[in-house]
Amino acid sequence: MSTTTPIVDFVRRYAQSGTSRLHMPGHKGQSLLGFEPWDITEIKGADELYGADGIIAQSEANATRLFGTVHTYYSTEGSSQCIRAMLCLALQAAPAAGQRPVLLAARNAHKALLYAAALLDFDIQWLWPAPQDAGALCSCPVSAAKLTGALQGLAQQGKRPFGVYITSPDYLGGVQDIAALAEVCKDFGVPLLVDNAHGAYLRFLPQGGQHPIALGAAMCCDSGHKTLPVVTGGAYLHLGKNAPIQDEAAVRNALALFGSTSPSYLILQSLDKCNQVLSEGYPLRLLQCCGHLTRLRRELNEAAAAKHCPGPLALESEPLKVTLDAAALGMTGTELAEALRCAKVECEYADPRYVVLMFTPANPPQDFERLTSAVLHIVENLTGPFPLPEKNDRELLELEHELHTCCSIRQAVFAPQEQVPTEQAVGRICAMPTVSCPPAIPIVVSGEKITPAAVRLMQKYHVMQAAVLRKTI
């Protein structure tokens, strides 16, 4: 059954009414780029995002039903806003402990987590990948056993984290066992918070059981704009039945704390219209897209195997990503990305080893064919053999062993700082996380000492400048 679009309908009626726009925004609905007639502000009847009781509330109710959550809230400032609000809510709900609040988090977190820690002033204890899993900056598999051990270790120190924070799917398409981690969190009475920015579509796979809320997460964020037909900036904050705070006013206040007082009605209309798309056959189109990608990966891997490539080319990943191991072709990820670019294929992300390509049902058949043709052309012209490098990232392992925290994240972020060349940063204290976006995953965290391994890793990922404290704390 098709879902209503109350925000879109209101704005279209207003745009067609001929009303004199003696209110913001300044373009007055006159077309410059084409969208201006539908760009409005909080006029009468338009509702208000952080105090919604009209058309926005109706639209969010539609999204809540579609995502199967206790309550779904809109964000016009991406998952970054939702991450900060989610952490704020978990912090508010945590029992008073008489000590600094601590979050247990997988190390491959987006830098939005660090900004939240700086603004909310909490500490982070990191979950690092096991040595055999330390293959890339973007990945940090966390097993139920590892999480249990970390929570037990904190308990022995008299500490109880206000939340466990996991990124899934990660930038390379890796997926955590959310159901198992949720059970561990339940046993310890700690909410599981999931950065599901790359996985909004998971709800609409068969049975909808792969979405974090369905798997037991207390709260999660989804970037609608990453994998659903939503314009950039459109995102969701989802609350599950285990969310520590369910009060609507508290949630909207947390979102308002980190959001603009002028949310984009263009983005709100996009989120609203997306509800209708999701209700009109989207799951079938999604399933067909995933099937095409399964066949695409198989074809690429069969071609690579026929040329005796030293390892799989298309890695196992979440359904809508194609993650290519360029080392299987004797190339770097950036070299492979450039070769694809010459074939009119633009990737989402490339690093020294991997190339990530993101598909959705909105991609036409030409896109699948073009990628397949471009990669097969490269495979057919290989002149190997060549060795496959180890998957373990030595610098990442050394980074954990050399870790030394000198001050809190908040102290570092708000302290006087300066930029220095990366090679001159050894021994200095990291101020702001320095890493490109994508993937926006910090190599060194604010407040940590920059070590030789950190410098090597920054250089590997082409980070040439580091923000450091001017003085030692």
Question: What are the residue ranges of the model-derived segments?
Answer:
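N-terminal "arm"/small-domain region of PLP-dependent enzymes with the aminotransferase-like
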Residues: 1-54, 190
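Conserved PLP-enzyme active-site core in the AAT-like
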Residues: 4-12, 78-310
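Short, glycine-/Ser/Thr-/acidic-enriched flexible segments
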Residues: 29, 171, 225-227, 242-244, ...
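Conserved N-terminal alpha-helix of the aminotransferase class I/II PLP-enzyme fold
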Residues: 36-81
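Short active-site oxyanion
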Residues: 70-72, 99-103, 443
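General small-molecule cofactor/ligand-binding pocket signal
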Residues: 73, 123-127, 348
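Conserved C-terminal alpha-helix-loop-beta "cap" of PLP-dependent enzymes
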Residues: 301-452, 457-463
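Terminal helix/beta-alpha structural elements that buttress the NAD(P)+-binding lobe
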Residues: 465, 470-472
